Amino acid sequence: MKTKLILSALLFSTFTFFGCNNEQPNYTGYWKGEADMIFEVFTENNIDYTIRNVNGDLTARYEDNALRGKNSLNMDILMRVKGDSAYYEFGEDESGKIVTGYMRISKDEYDRIFKAQTDAKASYN
């Protein structure tokens, strides 16, 4: 009986310890999705964020466990992070929403892809 009580207390304390993590996910860094879609996220205060890609910057704010803002079409955007995976959502209207997945990448990989995209954009214009 004593062993069962000790094991129960240990199990309960483990669930309490791991279940009460209120830390904000790490949004900052470099992200890559399908077809080399990349963006960088940075902040100075862990509340207001900048999301940058080859097309420019978006601003977002940390609210309700996600980054929230507007895209260049004035549509609501939302970004959630789980470990080294990011999920970017937009287009919540009658047509539904679009969710795209991204993985964390290194600065070197980001810089290489960003340069290639910038060069391609410049030659297109």
Feature locations, PLM:
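C-terminal motif of bacterial Sec signal peptides marking the signal peptidase cleavage site
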Residues: T16-G19
